[in-house]
């Protein structure tokens, strides 16, 4: 008799455990987007002819209010830090443009155009004299001079560098993730632009990123 009661109790418990009721969750208002925070163009003195799927790798961290991202690919290591910020890097993509130019799209969790940030960028030529420092200087913001960007270049392969924060355009064919990134930075006075050139004219380092093909960087 006791065995039958235990068996009935187990059956009843099993029947209760699989019972499922649909729960209607309230809609989200704070959608999680990737914000198109910056575009970095780097010219090199060796041939890079087209975007290579799987070439770019990335790692990111957020320590003591400093957001950092490290990218490797196309013979370069790019190390970028945004100081004293609430956001962090969430993704990056790289694409090859004309005349051996590499374009890097950088995405963060929040917009950059509300607060001026100091930025540090180190570019290392992985295959050409990577142990020598070619350039190390603090560049004032060339548009509004409200923040600064220090750029360090290790090696002899870089011909020009241009960094634009809060760009107002993006490749219409870039779909990673589809409909989940924003780039409508309407406050022009909050945008920034930094540039340095060695061989190329700086205007040759200004790519039309709407014409490039990009590949998302693989997260390590």
Curated annotation (Swiss-Prot):
KW Signal (keyword) present: yes
Tell me where the signal peptide lies.
1-17
Q: What main location does UniProt list?
A: host cell
What subcellular locations does the record give? Host endoplasmic reticulum; Secreted
Tell what triggers its expression: Expressed in the early phase of the viral replicative cycle.
The record's GO CC annotations read: extracellular space; host cell endoplasmic reticulum
List of glycosylated residues = 49, 79, 118, 154
Q: How is it modified after translation?
A: Glycosylated by host.
Q: Which GO terms describe its biological process?
A: symbiont-mediated suppression of host NF-kappaB cascade; symbiont-mediated suppression of host T-cell mediated immune response
- State the superkingdom: Viruses
Key word ATP-binding present: no
One annotated GO molecular function: protein sequestering activity
Q: Which InterPro entries match?
A: Poxvirus_M2
What keywords were assigned to this record?
Early protein, Glycoprotein, Host endoplasmic reticulum, Host-virus interaction, Inhibition of host NF-kappa-B by virus, Secreted, Signal, Viral immunoevasion
The record's similarity note reads:
Belongs to the orthopoxvirus OPG038 family.
Q: Quaternary state and partners of this protein?
A: Homooligomer. Interacts with host CD80 and CD86 when secreted.
The protein's role, per its UniProt record: Plays a role in immune evasion. When secreted, inhibits T-cell activation by preventing the binding of host CD80 and CD86 to soluble CTLA4 and CD28. In the infected cell, may inhibits host NF kappa B activation.
Protein name per UniProt? Early protein OPG038
